[in-house]
């Protein structure tokens, strides 16, 4: 074989090898493409099933919180949550907050709170003793967790707020703006649905605890006017975040602030703060048409702070030590009442629950049950009610619950900031225990030194 033939033969062999290799590569590509198409096709077929399941789950999850049941019979209070946010905040990213409250849907309970746009142990925590600023926002996190940027959900810009769930979506009410012209922004499922303008131009404010929902309608109480004299008070009825009706209370010589409201047998009862001249708590109860009754808790076991020593009560405002006050709550059971209050008569310290079997209508100071919650040597603060509906608990009654704010920092302690943690309890008809569940943080922090 001459050299030219050798070259032609070698070239032919290389060409054949190249063609075979190319065909193998093409076959490999086709095989991969077919395999991918089959997998993609399977995924496309599965997605409608997944979406169908998701939509079905949502449809089942959406209910109407009827609120028609009565409050559950209870004999005491079982501890429900404690977030330890100040202790955790000494080294972790935890919001500076005040006015925490709890509200439950048919699926979960969440802690709502008013931030100061700052974290604990940070320079922006300085001066956060101030109640109303443009930096304050309503946020929420799962109950029992310390509120941080990593687990919290923005709800509204607000220095006064309320929130509740009707079985379909969360309703939030956030008040912000200047003292002489604040506006409440209503959101339903996170979307602005309505607004309420200050009608007396004097610090429009609301509950700082959950609103109450019955049969798809939700209700709240707002105040506008002096904190130390006659003000104006309105009940609002809302449906899917829109105000459908309101009524102004005819309540001369009454003072309502920061009401704690709950449903009971299809009606709403609110127990509030008298910052003008009452050391006992005013109440307002109303039906779904906003037909209302008003009064004061008659018991000689006084519920506000500051207050006189227990004695003879009144079904009107108790004037001794009646000025100023603190947000609180009570639960009515017929003529009886569970009263939550600070242990101290003149400072926001300690907390206890007292059962007065005749206290809603009777003026004596006798009671049959007292359960310690926080020792008098530890700080407390605001407190308020919330409920767990049968749709959440599976019970045939509405479970009464309450939370207590444990304020730390200014003005009572040597810090540059004011914040708080919270604890909560729910009513049970079984064994409970009296103890002290204080905030427990060691102050001052590094930023305070």
Swiss-Prot record:
Residues 36-70 are annotated as: Hypervariable stalk region. It is a single-pass type II membrane protein. InterPro entries: Glyco_hydro_34, Sialidase_Influenza_A/B, Sialidase_sf. N-glycosylated. Its main location: virion. Inhibited by the neuraminidase inhibitors zanamivir (Relenza) and oseltamivir (Tamiflu). These drugs interfere with the release of progeny virus from infected cells and are effective against all influenza strains. Resistance to neuraminidase inhibitors is quite rare. It is found in: Virion membrane; Host apical cell membrane. Its cofactor is Ca(2+). Keywords: Calcium, Disulfide bond, Glycoprotein, Glycosidase, Host cell membrane, Host membrane, Hydrolase, Membrane, Metal-binding, Signal-anchor, Transmembrane, Transmembrane helix, Virion. Homotetramer. Catalyzes the removal of terminal sialic acid residues from viral and cellular glycoconjugates. Cleaves off the terminal sialic acids on the glycosylated HA during virus budding to facilitate virus release. Additionally helps virus spread through the circulation by further removing sialic acids from the cell surface. These cleavages prevent self-aggregation and ensure the efficient spread of the progeny virus from cell to cell. Otherwise, infection would be limited to one round of replication. The influenza A genome consist of 8 RNA segments. Genetic variation of hemagglutinin and/or neuraminidase genes results in the emergence of new influenza strains. The mechanism of variation can be the result of point mutations or the result of genetic reassortment between segments of two different strains. This is Neuraminidase. The gene is NA.
